[in-house]
Amino acid sequence: MDQVDRILEQWNRERPDLDVTPMGTFGRLKRLADQLLREMERVYQANDLTQAGFDVLATLRRSGPPYALTPSALISWTMVASGTMTNRLDRLEARGLIERRTNPADGRGSVVALTDEGLALIDRVVAEHVANQHRLIAGLPPELRPHLDEALRAWLASFEERAG
């Protein structure tokens, strides 16, 4: 029995007219997400990054050579507002991790590209990040992992379909 079970017991005692079963799912997801995010933040902080900065650098890195995307593509991949992205890019550019260049495709727009320093940093940090994720998921038996992924994928898809 965990803390969430004890909370559910209290609700069942106090409000037997309510089916509080979903509270267990949401309570555990919230507690787990909070703990996982705290653990992942340690990797970012150890490398003088925020999760937001990591997301931008990782998005550029996984795009493949020349590790450059338009600002609108970055916004689409990271799902943030334009102003939010501008602030992130300004901070990363000030650190020399990215640079804004004229878009070679049309000569008018711009692209955001990893610098050599940014590429070296994200290659190191993403390796640490993945190792950390392996460490964090080790508490879940390997045979349960595909089932969790399947359930979460289906649940997330139901929200994304409604959002259009």
Where are the language model's segments positioned?
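C-terminal regulatory/oligomerization modules of transcriptional regulators
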Residues: 1-17, 143-164
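Alpha-helical hairpin
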Residues: 18, 49-51, 114, 140
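Charged, amphipathic alpha-helical coiled-coil/dimerization segments
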Residues: 89-150
